[in-house]
Amino acid sequence: MKSYLAKPQEIERKWYVIDVAGKPLGRAASQIASILRGKNKPIYTPNVDTGDYVIVLNAEKVLLTGKKADQKMFRHHTLYPGGLKEMSYKDAIAKKADFVFYEAVRRMLPSGVLGRKMIKKLKVYKGEEHNNEAQKPEVLELKY
């Protein structure tokens, strides 16, 4: 029996809306990364982008367990000497919660061309409102 290989023309893409208020950051990000890769479909093929579109709401209300909010640092470098900038996750979520959630999901995807294609299907919003009603997204509840 031959293995099934999905072709890009055959893929049906759905839109999902996920509310992450009160959900742990890592658990929500890993499930969303799995949906973006297409691992929830029977036609999953590792070298083809078979994933669906995901709209994430309430990114600022995501939960960090333990002391991570204060102790874990969000770092980036400006590429100038001495340009390492760092802030705690509590401050980062207060300032740019959508970017923090976006980065958590991006780091769980492959790091090549296919991963860059997959991350473009993720839309992250602060608050309850989004502007993708025209796509008729389905509400999806995360497992944990």
UniProtKB/Swiss-Prot annotation:
Q: Which terms under GO biological process does the entry name?
A: negative regulation of translation; translation
Which UniProt key words apply to this protein? Ribonucleoprotein, Ribosomal protein
Q: Which Pfam families match?
A: Ribosomal_L13
Q: Which InterPro entries match?
A: Ribosomal_uL13 (IPR005822), Ribosomal_uL13_bac-type (IPR005823), Ribosomal_uL13_CS (IPR023563), Ribosomal_uL13_sf (IPR036899)
Report the SS bond pairs: none
UniProt xrefs under CDD domains: Ribosomal_L13 (cd00392)
GO CC annotations?
cytosolic large ribosomal subunit
Stretches assigned to coiled coil? none
**Example GO molecular function term?**
mRNA binding
Subunit info here reads: Part of the 50S ribosomal subunit.
Q: Which HAMAP family match?
A: Ribosomal_uL13 (MF_01366)
Q: Give the protein's biological function.
A: This protein is one of the early assembly proteins of the 50S ribosomal subunit, although it is not seen to bind rRNA by itself. It is important during the early stages of 50S assembly.
The cross-references to PANTHER family, in alphabetical order and at most eight, read: LARGE RIBOSOMAL SUBUNIT PROTEIN UL13M, RIBOSOMAL PROTEIN L13
Family per UniProt? Belongs to the universal ribosomal protein uL13 family.
NCBIfam families referenced in this protein's UniProt entry, alphabetically:
rplM_bact
Name the record gives this protein: Large ribosomal subunit protein uL13
Query: Which organism encodes this protein?
Result: Clostridium acetobutylicum (strain ATCC 824 / DSM 792 / JCM 1419 / IAM 19013 / LMG 5710 / NBRC 13948 / NRRL B-527 / VKM B-1787 / 2291 / W)
Its lineage opens with: Bacteria, Bacillati, Bacillota, Clostridia, Eubacteriales
